[in-house]
A protein has these predicted regions:
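Short, small/acidic-rich helices and loops at N termini and domain boundaries
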Residues: 1-94
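Glycine-biased, small-residue-rich flexible motifs in mid-sequence functional cores and linkers
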Residues: 2-9, 88-213
């Protein structure tokens, strides 16, 4: 699958992001895997889009004609990300995690802030669980996370209430590494965990999302 992610689109981040503003992630992957070049994509007609199994064909065709508008929006997004210290990594970049490329629908972009080296960390463990956990469940998540963090594992969770929150806190309690996967870099939910997100960054952790902020 990695061999598919080569070609014309790999050389222009601004252009690739503009296409992501038009298409969803799955749609953009279709274009990447079609091996079309920039000019061919901009000139896609109704029949071409149908052949690529796209829906909402009329909208896509119109948006591609107005690519300059999306390039302007893309440039604005990139400038804003730079100001806010958020790194954008495309599936074409060397820093993109190899293991992420091999999933069925990999994100074309990942957005991150903090310790970028965690993207290549070899020892990772994810914690997933209910937001409405019992006190016992919270304690187990905290202690288990702390144990693995002490053994150099990067603790990955979603910064939500409950198990996620306990897992992050367990890692931080032993000055371990932890990564929070967010809806987007602006959407820290619940608001009460904004301080936890800041602590993750202060302690060499990482905030990560696949969606444009």
């Amino acid at each position: 699958m990695q061999d598919l992610f080569k070609g014309d689109l790999s050389f222009d981040l601004e252009y690739l992001l503009a296409l992501r503003l038009i298409f969803d992630n799955k749609g953009l992957l279709k274009l990447i895997n079609s091996n079309l070049n920039k000019e061919e994509i901009l000139n896609l007609k109704e029949l071409d889009l149908k052949n690529l199994n796209f829906k909402s064909i009329e909208r896509y065709e119109e948006d591609l004609k107005n690519i300059k508008k999306y390039l302007t929006l893309s440039k604005g997004v990139l400038e804003k990300l730079n100001k806010e210290g958020i790194k954008i990594i495309s599936i074409f970049d060397k820093g993109y995690p190899e293991r992420l490329k091999i999933i069925e629908i990999p994100p074309v972009f990942i957005f991150c802030k903090g310790n970028f080296s965690l993207l290549e960390n070899k020892k990772n463990i994810a914690f997933v669980g209910t937001r409405k956990c019992s006190e016992l469940g919270s304690t187990i998540a905290f202690k288990t996370s702390a144990f693995f963090a002490q053994n150099k594992f990067n603790i990955i969770s979603g910064l939500a209430k409950g198990i996620d929150e306990s897992a992050h806190k367990g890692a931080l309690s032993v000055d371990g590494l932890t990564t929070a996967v967010l809806v987007d870099m602006k959407s820290i939910s619940p608001n009460s965990n904004k301080n936890l997100a800041e602590e993750i960054l202060k302690k060499n952790g990482l905030l990560l999302s696949e969606n444009i902020p």
